[in-house]
Structures are given as C-alpha cells and as structure tokens.
Amino acid sequence: MSALRNADHVHRRYSLDDYLDLLERSTIRLEYVAGYIYAMTGASREHIQINSNLHGEFYIHLKGTNCSVSSNDMQVGVQDENGEEAYVFPDLTLACQPEDLRRVNKRDDVLFNPSAVFEVLSSSNEDYDQKTKLSLYQLIPSMTDIVFVRQDSIEIVHWTRLTGEWLSRTYAGLDATMTVLDCAIILQDIYRGVTF
C-alpha cells in the first residue's frame, strides 16, 4: 500500500481523538504515527497476489494451532519510544493466543500483541515501512518476526528477534525458504502468479 500524507496534512499534527474521528468516517485505512495521519491507498496487482499467497500459505500452516492469520484490515496498536500511541495496518498479521484485542474506536478491534507482521513493499512505501514501521514493530514485546517482501523482484528481508536482539536476513531466489512461527515457506509459493 502507498503511504501518503495528504498535502493538506503534511505539516499538521493530529491528536489521537482527531485520528479516531477521521478513521471512523473514512472509507480507506488510515495509519497514525507520531501525530501524523497516513492514508493507505490502493495496491498493485503484484501486491495483492503476494499478499493473497502469504495469507493462503500461513492459513494452511497455522490451521489447528493457537495462531491465526489476518489480512490488511487488522489494525495493530503500539506505544512508540515516546509513549505515544501509534496505529498501523500491516499487510498481513500473525497472532497467537491469547490475543490482546482492544476496542479503540467504534468500528474496529485493535491487536496489541502480534507475533509476526508482513509488509509488501513498493517504491512509494518502502522507506516508510522499513524505517518508521520497522522501528514501531520492534517495540512490541510479543513480536518475533517482521518481514518485508519486495514486489518488483524476488527478495525478502526477514527480521527475527533472538534473545532480545533483532537480526535481519535477506532471502532471494525462488528456491529459498523462510521460516516464521515454525512455518517453512518457499519463496516460489510467495511469488506464485507474479510476473516481473
């Protein structure tokens, strides 16, 4: 998804109440980070295909476990390093029981303890996702895996928390295998149906 600050909002900070009011009335997903509101706009065909493939693979692998997979409509809440609340919409979220779901606005439950999140990158969102959102995701105590999937080439950057430290690994090529929450997924299955 594209991370765009609307030109009218670039230099304006919003209160959490302002954000929640706008979110309640919005027909698109809005993220709230450090007082700024980001509109999450339409996705490319490749983005949609990759996200669908990820959802299908993890649904199959997690079926019958205490973990679940949610699409990009699952909002994740986190307190940033300054103690401010932030609310984002990962492209894919994996959560294990017990889920910490809280009603933050009138229409949605917000997940505060995801185990893993995935972001499908595009030229318009990769800086925002790999810098701003990565730093937020790394603050979530329950988070073990943060995955960035390129849609313009076969490449995945996988951040894993091991003994309190975050380590990254890059996977490239259709034969590579990535493991998240004990689910081994071959990149060929993630990129199935995507042409470059």
Task: Describe each model-derived feature in a short phrase.
Residues 1-196:
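Gly/Pro/Ser/Thr-rich low-complexity, intrinsically disordered segments predominantly at protein N-termini
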